[in-house]
Structure formats: C-alpha cells, structure tokens
C-alpha cells in the first residue's frame, strides 16, 4: 500500500512540475470527456501523458478495455502460438529449428537443475554455479553470457555475467538464478552505429505486426528502445527510453519517451552519451522488416510485438510477445486508434 501511495505521489509531482502541462481546467474537461467516451476511469490519461500540450487527439489512445479486448481476443490469438511466444526457451528453440536468427542457446535451467550439452547437472551453491559458468565461458570462448527468465517480462529476471567480474556477479545473482527457470544465450555483438547511441545494453526495435482477414501481414508501427544509466537492459519498464521510428526510412523521429514512474522525460539526446536522436538511421532496417514478416509466417498469431536487435551482421530476433500492453507503442505512435488498420483490429477482436 505504501509503495502504491509513494508511486501516486511521484506521479502527481511529475504532472504538477511538468512545464508542458495543459491548464488544470482543460485537463479536468478532457478527463471527463475521456471517461464518457471510453466508459472507464481514465487513469491512462495520465500514464500516457495525454495531459501534455501537444496532445489534442487524446481519444485516439487506447483505453484499458480496448487493450484487453485485443490481448484477450481468441480470434486474434491462438494458444498454439501464444504457448511458444510466452516461453522464451520454446521460442528460441523454434526459431533455431526454422533457421531464423536468434542469440545462440548455451544452456538452460529449471531452478537447480541445469541442462548443458545433453547432460543434466544439479547445482546447489554459489561455488558450484561459479564453477559451472566459468566452465561454459572457457569451453565456448565467451567473455560474457546473457541469462533471462523463461517466462519473465519487462527485463525482469535478466542477468549479464562476465568473465572479468564473474565471482562478484555470482555472489550477487546466484540466489535468483537458482530460484528461477532461465535460458542462457550468447551476447549479441551489437552494431557499432547503435553502440554510438548507448553501448551498455542491447537496444532493440519493437515491431507490432497484424495479420488481416485476407492473411496479409502488416507492420503496424516501430519504435526503438535504449538503456540508460549503465543499465544492460533497454526495457521501458526498467527505466529505458524509447523513440518512434519512421517505417519507410528507418530513422528515429521526435523526442524520446519514458514511463512516468521513471520521470517521463522527453529528450532530444541520450542522457548518457549526448547522442542526438533525430534522424538517426537504424542499420539493416529493411532487412529487419523482411525478417519480421518471415517470422510471422512461421508464428502466425494475428497480433505480435517483436523485439529485434541489430548485430554487426544484420537483424536478430530476441523475442515475440502476444500479451502486449500497448502502452509504449500507443505513446510512440501518437494514438494507435488513428492507425488505418486499428478499426479492423477492434472489429476482429
């Protein structure tokens, strides 16, 4: 309860201090209108920054009911696809089986049971885990290894272990690693141009795809995420920032966005590197779009959010999500309901 109250106080403080805020009377008027139109308490009005001066089309943003209508739709989502998408191990194995590029699987674990090179090992202590990871790094000639929860979301349950600091990192993360189910993968060698923006995290592009009733695959939108403050994850729910991407040119556009609980800042430059976002052209962008459409043909759930990384050799699929909250893409697009296909999506839901 105290955590929720503190979060509410922080949000109120951010709204009051926001120099780009509309007048309180206008905000109140729009809240009532949004409430009537959407038929629900308009908490998304603040969470999606619809109180800011540049937002005049606030009713074009999805309500929680509209999001639930899409994400819970049995017409748009099928269990046989979502069961693969929601299990990161199954997803990576399925992609590998169909020769679609994903970070190479090294091993995986179910709590203290580890599966490596067709062997099952029981690991029950920090020392045993250290010895095991050290062995993997040496046998695979790896400097780092990335670990993520098989069912986690939003950067939760992710760890980056390095040969250089392995002892310290194992002491810090062993308890969590041994208490969850994880997939261990090679670290992607990120493209140098993307590293110029922020080098400490794997910065991914989120593509939303939709298969219409004629089985045509559409890319609805794209935005790119970057980590901040030394973080090795780029997720907005972990404090990262994100920007809209022009689907035709592959260039970043506008200022960055950030979730309100992390300050909701709008920036022209990355806060750590001072790299100017506007018009940065993403390498291998056309290849990324082609890869996404190919991936959809192998996993034809009708709406998926795909995360794509850009390596020095081309795009790599990180994961797909059928249970998209649509908060970040809705903000990045500037109101998803103005998209020409969203009327059809809601009708099909």
Q: Model regions: which residues?
A:
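Active-site ExK catalytic segment of metal-dependent nucleases
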Residues: 148, 185, 223, 319-323
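Conserved N-proximal alpha/beta basic substrate-recognition cap immediately N-terminal to
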Residues: 7-135, 292
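Active-site nucleotide/adenylate-binding loops and adjacent lid/helix of ATP-dependent enzymes
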Residues: 88-205, 210-213
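Extracellular structured ligand-interaction cores
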Residues: 142-144, 202-206, 219, 303-305, ...
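C-terminal active-site "lid" helix and adjoining low-complexity regulatory extension at the edge
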Residues: 265-290, 294-301, 310-349
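ATP-dependent carboxylate/phosphate-activation module, predominantly the ATP-grasp catalytic core
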Residues: 197-198, 202-287
């Amino acid at each position: 309860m105290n955590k929720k109250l503190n979060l509410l106080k922080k949000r109120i403080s951010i709204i009051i201090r926001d120099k780009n805020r509309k007048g309180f009377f206008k905000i109140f008027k729009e809240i009532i209108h949004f409430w009537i139109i959407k038929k629900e308490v308009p908490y998304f009005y603040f969470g999606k920054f619809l109180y800011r001066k540049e937002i005049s089309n606030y009713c074009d943003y999805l309500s929680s009911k509209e999001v639930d209508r899409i994400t819970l739709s049995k017409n748009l989502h099928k269990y046989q696809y979502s069961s693969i998408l929601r299990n990161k191990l199954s997803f990576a194995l399925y992609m590998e089986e169909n020769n679609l590029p994903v970070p190479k699987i090294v091993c995986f674990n179910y709590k203290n049971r580890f599966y490596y090179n067709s062997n099952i090992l029981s690991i029950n202590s920090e020392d045993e885990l250290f010895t095991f990871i050290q062995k993997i790094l040496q046998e695979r000639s790896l400097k780092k290894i990335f670990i993520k929860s098989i069912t986690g979301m939003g950067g939760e349950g992710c760890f980056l272990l390095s040969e250089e600091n392995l002892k310290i990192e194992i002491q810090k993360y062993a308890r969590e690693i041994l208490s969850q189910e994880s997939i261990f993968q090679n670290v992607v060698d990120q493209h140098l141009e993307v590293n110029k923006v922020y080098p400490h995290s794997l910065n991914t592009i989120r593509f939303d795809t939709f298969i219409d009733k004629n089985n045509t695959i559409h890319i609805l939108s794209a935005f790119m995420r970057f980590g901040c403050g030394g973080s090795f994850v780029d997720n907005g729910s972990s404090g990262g920032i994100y920007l809209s991407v022009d689907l035709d040119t592959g260039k970043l556009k506008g200022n960055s966005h950030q979730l309100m609980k992390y300050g909701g800042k709008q920036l022209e430059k990355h806060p750590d590197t001072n790299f100017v976002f506007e018009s940065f052209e993403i390498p291998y962008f056309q290849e990324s779009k082609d890869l996404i459409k190919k991936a959809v043909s192998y996993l034809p759930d009708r709406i998926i959010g795909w995360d794509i990384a850009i390596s020095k050799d081309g795009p790599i699929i990180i994961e797909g999500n059928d249970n998209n909250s649509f908060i970040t893409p809705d903000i990045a697009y500037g109101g998803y309901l103005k998209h020409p296909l969203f009327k059809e999506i809601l009708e099909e839901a």
